[in-house]
């Protein structure tokens, strides 16, 4: 009986297959194939997880509408122009992107370190830029769904009227604003990792000031030129101002600067933040190799 089992196993598993030196090696991706594979693999959990847990329909859509409703009723109480209602709805939708960058991108490497995954990322042949890009694309997909839900519901509830002047410019503004914003998130993710436990406090500290200086609920033109110019380092500031100029009739009269200039600034911010994120990642990896640990507190 045992001889029959042995001969059967020999027929199913050849000795050559058990030897690591024999036969063809398992093909492994490298270069751009590995880069794309890493991006897809890292974005997959965020995209699929969005469909498996539908509780976000309540927590990430209906609850943010409450703050939108507050500003809408304030504007209606003071008899503000109707376009201000649309400003609030669009701004409330864009908050979702800032929250995703703040908590889903900037703090992500710190949480990966706490869970023990960061060392695996660094030891793997995959590029850290590809890992962060995958997180950004996955987060962008899920956040876009939430923002669309807020815009649709807010527009229906408050009868917001849109007058798009240029779809091409609107797409360019949104695309460049997202590239710059998530580039900022990729850059600050390395910074947060170096700061270690202070990352949580920085995220809490950065949340409300950006609400103010990005002009989520009002035109930033009211700040005056110099404050608006300094606030423009935040990609959402320029992105929101340009989108409002393109989708509302009174937008151009309430805009900070012209849309073509804002598009140029967003393109420049995209390059700066993406390049800075690459430098920060290179420094983080060098620190890990030199000191034998992923991060340390700088005091």
Would you name each region that the model predicts?
Residues 2-299:
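Hydrophobic transmembrane alpha-helices and immediately adjacent juxtamembrane helices
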């Amino acid at each position: 009986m045992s001889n029959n089992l042995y001969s059967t196993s020999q027929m199913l598993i050849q000795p050559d297959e058990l030897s690591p030196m024999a036969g063809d090696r398992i093909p492994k991706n490298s270069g751009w194939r590995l880069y794309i594979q890493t991006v897809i693999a890292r974005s997959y959990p965020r995209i699929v997880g969005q469909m498996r847990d539908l509780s976000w329909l309540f927590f990430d859509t209906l609850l943010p509408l409450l703050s939108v409703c507050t500003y809408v009723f304030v504007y209606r109480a003071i008899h503000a122009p109707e376009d201000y209602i649309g400003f609030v709805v669009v701004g409330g939708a864009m908050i979702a992107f800032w929250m995703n960058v703040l908590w889903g991108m900037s703090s992500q490497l710190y949480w990966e370190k706490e869970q023990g995954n960061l060392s695996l990322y660094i030891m793997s042949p995959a590029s850290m830029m590809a890992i962060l890009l995958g997180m950004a694309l996955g987060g962008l997909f899920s956040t876009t769904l939430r923002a669309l839900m807020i815009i649709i519901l807010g527009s229906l509830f408050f009868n917001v009227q849109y007058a798009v002047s240029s779809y091409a410019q609107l797409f360019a503004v949104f695309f460049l604003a997202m590239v710059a914003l998530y580039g900022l998130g990729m850059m600050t993710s390395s910074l947060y990792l170096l700061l270690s436990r202070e990352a949580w406090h920085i995220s809490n500290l950065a949340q409300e000031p950006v609400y103010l200086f990005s002009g989520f609920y009002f035109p930033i033109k009211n700040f005056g030129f110099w404050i608006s110019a300094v606030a423009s380092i935040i990609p959402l500031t320029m992105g929101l101002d340009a989108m409002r100029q393109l989708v509302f009739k009174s937008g151009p009269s309430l805009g900070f600067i012209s849309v073509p200039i804002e598009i140029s600034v967003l393109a420049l911010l995209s390059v700066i933040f993406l390049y800075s994120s690459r430098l920060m990642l290179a420094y983080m990896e060098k620190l890990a190799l030199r000191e034998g640990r992923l991060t340390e507190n700088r005091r």
